[in-house]
């Protein structure tokens, strides 16, 4: 199977740039996997490989595509029928699109990790807790507030990337100094994760009113389970944090939500922990960080699951099997 990549439009150093897909790329003239947003945006890729009998795309942006431009929605929904299989990280969009299009094109997929970047030996936990990401919702503010009295790290691309309500001068003056690392390379981030007991996260997208209206303009939008709580302006999004934390032995402390998408790939209680209310976070961080020996096995279980079930090799094999169906 040939693998064609184009990362135009991606972040500077996302985890998928470290997959090294080309080590698995063998052109048989029959099957091809497209990876990267640029493969959708640049028509030359489809034109050059249209003669292949079996074509797949790995879609990492669902459900974000559904509040973008209609042109991009069409590409992301495979409206031209170019791809035989689309492996997507949004299981709800997969089910919805298959029902709407009356095909079996879309396949729920995990986010893998390149085992060549694994560190087999455990490292000393010198940090209590970490959050990496932006501030786009009061929940993220609460994450930072909850961590600040501990030995914490807050990794961000910078306040310039935060949602508009959190870019006011007053807010930036108060919270930007809490950033401990800005726009760090992936390898450096993984090193920090390995030295950290807890990673707090929410597998949600927080929408603006205009984004909600765009989604509601899509015919049949209400049949997508991902849109079941638009009244709260939230969508489920399976981010890369879970696999990156699991592969680096940091305990996932996940905010419970209406979908709990993390349970598709990891088991609650044995491989990660939930918290229900933001105000519970400080006490949970205190409990786990002070009694790490009672909780370390959870991070270790997640590490075993990630390194056995969610490797890049396994993903490539799943794509090939899917194209053979």
PLM-predicted stretches and their roles:
Residues 1-29, 34-47, 60-265:
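Nucleotide-sugar donor-binding catalytic core of glycosyltransferases
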Residues 51-59:
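Short beta-strand/loop segments at the ligand-binding rim of alpha/beta enzyme cores
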Residues 239, 272-278, 287-292:
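Conserved acidic donor-binding segment of nucleotide-sugar-dependent glycosyltransferases
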Residues 252-253, 270-276, 318-325:
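Short, contiguous hydrophobic alpha-helices characteristic of membrane insertion segments
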Residues 261-272, 284:
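Acidic, glycine-centered active-site loop in nucleotide-sugar glycosyltransferases
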Residues 290-321:
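A charged, aromatic-enriched C-terminal amphipathic alpha-helix characteristic of glycosyltransferases
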């Amino acid at each position: 199977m040939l693998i064609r990549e184009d990362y135009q439009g991606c972040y500077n150093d996302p985890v998928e740039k470290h997959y090294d897909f080309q080590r698995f790329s063998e052109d048989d003239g029959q099957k091809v996997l497209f990876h990267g947003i640029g493969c959708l945006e640049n028509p030359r890729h489809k034109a050059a490989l249209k003669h292949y009998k079996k074509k797949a795309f790995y879609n990492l942006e669902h459900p974000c595509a559904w509040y973008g431009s209609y042109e991009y929605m069409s590409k992301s929904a495979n409206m031209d029928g170019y791809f035989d299989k689309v492996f997507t990280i949004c299981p709800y969009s997969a089910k919805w699109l298959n029902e709407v299009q009356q095909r079996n094109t879309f396949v729920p997929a995990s986010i893998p990790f390149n085992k060549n970047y694994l560190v087999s030996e455990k490292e000393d936990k010198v940090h209590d807790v970490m959050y990496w990401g932006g501030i786009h919702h009061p929940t993220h503010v609460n994450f930072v507030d909850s961590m600040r009295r501990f030995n914490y790290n807050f990794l961000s691309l910078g306040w310039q990337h935060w949602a508009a309500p959190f870019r006011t001068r007053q807010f930036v003056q108060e919270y930007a100094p809490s950033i401990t690392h800005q726009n760090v390379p992936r390898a450096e981030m993984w090193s920090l994760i390995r030295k950290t007991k807890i990673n707090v996260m929410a597998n949600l997208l927080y929408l603006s009113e205009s984004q909600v209206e765009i989604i509601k303009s899509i015919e049949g939008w209400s049949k997508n389970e991902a849109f079941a709580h638009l009244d709260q302006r939230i969508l489920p999004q399976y981010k890369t944090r879970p696999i990156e934390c699991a592969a680096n032995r940091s305990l996932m402390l996940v905010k419970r939500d209406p979908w709990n998408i993390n349970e598709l790939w990891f088991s609650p209680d044995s491989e990660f922990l939930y918290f229900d209310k933001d105000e519970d976070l400080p006490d949970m961080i205190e409990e786990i960080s002070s009694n790490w020996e009672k909780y370390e096995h959870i991070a270790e279980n997640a590490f075993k699951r990630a390194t056995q079930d969610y490797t890049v090799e396994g993903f490539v094999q799943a794509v090939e099997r899917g194209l053979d169906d």
